[in-house]
């Protein structure tokens, strides 16, 4: 084979969705627009988990995008479980060169995929940097003090957001799937930390890859709800402070894990807002 011949690159795109049909369809439309900007040698296959949707999201996806592999579940997988179901289905189907995590609410710019692949490397996870509708950084990567980093930043990424992430086969073969303990939140942070602990790097795209608003509001810190309701929300499957405890214990220290666990409870019991 000649050195200038182009090799086909096969990429599995992983997504999980729950009851936001219109958002999902817009997200997929923006994804395929970005695909159209890529060279013909790049081949994308989407594996999308319908996590027990009752609004017909999965059926709408199959009708609009029959090429998407829709995997229906009974529900209750949340983000981490749903992404792992998609990932397992993809890895059983083919030994892909890359895997992409894609949030269905990510409205990608046409240049998004070009942006993540222009900084690709076999020893690197690429996290796409997003902006909100006021053009402030919303997702991508954070410093150790949880400050969001701008596109192209060379500062070390400590916390990686999972909105649009490119993972090479080499790293997947080393790290495997998302830790099943992190059923919803924390799975992206944990995966990035595991990568760094295995001497891989996390880099950010040089440009914004799309638009998505922050989802920082924690209802269990809202003093307008009665205490019993706040505590119920805090100890729900998605928000249980034991999840954050494990993340900090696993990657930081027991002291920091206890601190974050205690703070979550204190701020819920004595909310400021």
Regions found by a protein language model. Name each.
Residues 50-59:
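A conserved acidic beta->alpha catalytic loop
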């Amino acid at each position: 084979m000649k050195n200038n011949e182009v090799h086909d690159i096969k990429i599995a795109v992983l997504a999980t969705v729950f009851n936001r049909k219109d958002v999902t369809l817009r997200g997929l439309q923006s994804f395929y627009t970005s695909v159209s900007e890529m060279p013909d040698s790049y081949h994308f296959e989407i594996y999308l988990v319908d996590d027990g949707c009752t609004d017909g999201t999965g059926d709408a996806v199959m009708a609009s995008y029959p090429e998407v592999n829709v995997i229906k579940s009974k529900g209750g997988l949340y983000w981490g479980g749903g992404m792992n179901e998609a990932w397992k289905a993809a890895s059983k189907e083919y030994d892909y060169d890359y895997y992409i995590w894609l949030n269905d609410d990510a409205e990608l710019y046409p240049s998004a995929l070009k942006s993540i692949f222009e900084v690709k490397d076999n020893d690197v996870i690429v996290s796409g940097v997003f902006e909100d509708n006021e053009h402030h950084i919303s997702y991508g990567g954070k410093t150790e003090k949880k400050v969001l980093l701008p596109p192209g930043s060379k500062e070390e990424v400590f916390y990686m957001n999972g909105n649009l992430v490119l993972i090479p086969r080499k790293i997947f073969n080393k790290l495997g799937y998302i830790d099943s303990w992190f059923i919803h939140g924390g799975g992206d942070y944990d995966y990035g930390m595991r990568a760094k602990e295995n001497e891989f790097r996390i880099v950010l795209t040089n440009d914004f890859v799309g638009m998505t608003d922050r989802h920082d509001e924690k209802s269990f810190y809202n003093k307008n709800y009665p205490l019993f309701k706040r505590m119920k929300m805090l100890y729900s499957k998605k928000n249980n402070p034991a999840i954050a405890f494990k993340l900090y214990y696993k990657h930081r220290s027991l002291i920091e894990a206890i601190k974050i666990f205690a703070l979550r409870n204190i701020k819920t019991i004595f909310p400021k807002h």
